[in-house]
Amino acid sequence: MRTSPRRPLILKRRRLPLPIQNAPSETSEEEAKRSPGQQEPTQAQASQDVAESSSCKFPAGIKIINHPTVPNTQVVAIPNNADIQSIITALTAKGKESGSSGPNKFILISSGGASSHPPDPQSQAQTSTDSKRTELITETLGPKPGAKGVPVPKPPGALPRQRQESCGGEAAGCTLDNSLTNIQWLGKMSSDGLGRCSIKQELEEKENCHLEQNRVKVEAPSRASVSWQDSVSERPPYSYMAMIQFAINSTERKRMTLKDIYTWIEDHFPYFKHIAKPGWKNSIRHNLSLHDMFVRETSANGKVSFWTIHPSANRYLTLDQVFKPLEPGSPQSPEHLESQQKRPNPELRRNVTIKTELPLGARRKMKPLLPRVSSYLVPIQFPVNQSLVLQPSVKVPLPLAASLMSSELARHSKRVRIAPKVLLSNEGIAPLPATEPMKEEKPLLGEGLLPLLPIQSIKEEVIQPGEDIPHLERPIKVESPPLEEWPSPCASVKEELSNSWEDSSCSPTPKPKKSYCGLKSPTRCVSEMLVTKRREKREVSRSRRKQHLQPPCLDEPELFFSEDSSTFRPAMEILAESSEPAPQLSCPQEEGGPFKTPIKETLPVSSTPSKSVLSRDPESWRLTPPAKVGGLDFSPVRTPQGAFGPLPDSLGLMELNTTPLKSVPLFDSPRELLNSEAFDLASDPFSSSPPPHLEAKPGSPELQVPSLSANRSLTEGLVLDTMNDSLSKILLDISFPGLEEDPLGPDNINWSQFIPELR
């Protein structure tokens, strides 16, 4: 990058004034400053000066012009063939004659063509000028001690280069004139015509001459001296490792001792010899030891150690290689590019161009010493989890099947789009309890009927939707084989559901099936509660939005149902996706019990996986504690304690002193209950075994509540509403066929204990 040939004038003014220490050099500098204005005089001044020159005994062809800006100063144009010594003598005499009023300073410029004057007359003229300078100062410059009229000879040069040559030619002869402050004409100077003097080169650099002109005019001796001075003041733009390579590769055998490396660097980079601190040698030794490319070899006698470059790492970098000229289009050296980036000083850059004498684009570009790898982005594809596919015919244990189903449901739930949260009543969806006896209540409440309908209506409502829901169908099929292994006295509703789903998948119109409505086995209920708890924990941890769910009420849990009977199809979908059917309790909000007009549900629907209502046992309600522990005499129906033994209370509802809870009736009518009980008496395989739920895990939270003794019967669910007008009718319709025990008669029932409101 070339330096701009012109700088702001303020910088030039600050830079040029120098202290009066070396009179000859300073005078030459000052006269160099004055010289450029010699091309700006008017024709009138030129003719006037010519007349003066003719009158002052000057040889023919000499032109004397007043300086445009400097007072009492004249510019003398000397032809190539003129005698410089005689002209200097005439100018000295003229200065003495004029005294303080006339011009006492003369600037000599050559007015001929190419410079052909030998250097010897120039040196003689300069010496004569120096000898006469004191005379001029003492004799002719009495009133002006600061002004010195010193004519300085110049080698003849081309006429268009008069200003440039004058700035160099007067370098040897004059002292500084403090009164000369206007140097605006310096910006118009150029350095085309230059002499062979090193001082001229210094002046050119200080006056911001073009780099190409420097390369053309500067010769080897001055170039060496100037580059030495510039490099001393500026640190070389090479690393220690690069300079070590330059030194080692400069030898024929490509090896060098440590002392020779020091010497080579000092010779080629005087900065380290004159300016740098001695610690740079430590850096050289450090780099020799640090980089593996430098290998230390010992001579045969073991006294001398040489440093070489490993052949595999040696790129044979030399200092000459950096500046070696090549054909156009060849790459440039990285060292030179690095030097251009690192050094802001234009003088050092000028030094490089002086040494090369070639344009910047003709230098070699080499591979970087330390190649770098450009960074880039690597695209990464995240795998998508595929849903687990289960064969419906595979029989797996219940916990494993439940875990597989819960993981699959969790994955399916993540793919479902999140819908806005709305009330269930708006969409006609009702959360269904998972207890089989409770499912009987769906058509009753939805249609506003008394609990006197057969259970077949439930099956038709559940099966009739007939819609294929693939991810819901699989979990039901997986669960169905373990259900068939239970020797239950009557077919459970869950088995019925699974069979109906399989039938609906085969035929477009599902067949409603009739079956006895009975409770599942206690062990089955316990395992389902464990599975439900495990599934809830997993889905809560996998949900994208952690929601703080309101904990279910511990005293009187409430479940609400919609009046619309068309809500059972979506409700089944929610039930199958949220949890496995488990015994739950439905507690109406009012004291009226389940036989009153149903209340519209107000539970919000959340698209995120949420906890379902925890499982409850059908005998979670409370009566006044009985006085004895034996079998209940006040129960209208005697039930076998093995099949319908006590079940665990998952929510602590069995504790004493709790408010009596109103529950959904377990059966459509006492007659149907008694029929199922009679069937159970004949075919119950668990009648002689202890309650199987006691064998469940003791650490599960569902089993921490102490189990009830045998003083609770499932028929405690027949808590009737005393405010209902149909109470007497329902009680009168109760008959007990097939049971001949006396305590089962309605006359022996203690209704004050059975219904607390009668007290």
Swiss-Prot record:
| This protein's name | Forkhead box protein M1
> Polar residues bias located where?
36-54, 604-613
Tell me, using the record's free text, what induces this protein: Activated in S phase.
Biological source species: Rattus norvegicus
PTM comment, free text? Phosphorylated in M (mitotic) phase. Phosphorylation by the checkpoint kinase CHEK2 in response to DNA damage increases the FOXM1 protein stability probably stimulating the transcription of genes involved in DNA repair. Phosphorylated by CDK1 in late S and G2 phases, creating docking sites for the POLO box domains of PLK1. Subsequently, PLK1 binds and phosphorylates FOXM1, leading to activation of transcriptional activity and subsequent enhanced expression of key mitotic regulators. Phosphorylated by GSK3B leading to ubiquitination and proteasomal degradation.
* Lipid metabolism recorded as keyword: no
Q: Could you tell me where the Basic and acidic residues compositional bias lies?
A: 335-349, 531-542
Top-level taxon of the source organism: Eukaryota
Q: In which tissues is it expressed?
A: Highly expressed in thymus and testis, but weakly in intestine and lung. Appears to be expressed only in adult organs containing proliferating/cycling cells or in response to growth factors.
DNA-binding region, as residue ranges, is located at 234-326
The UniProt record lists the Glycyl lysine isopeptide (Lys-Gly) (interchain with G-Cter in SUMO2) crosslink at 200, 324, 355, 421, 439
Kindly list the positions at which Phosphoserine occurs in this protein.
Answer: 330, 375, 521, 726, 735
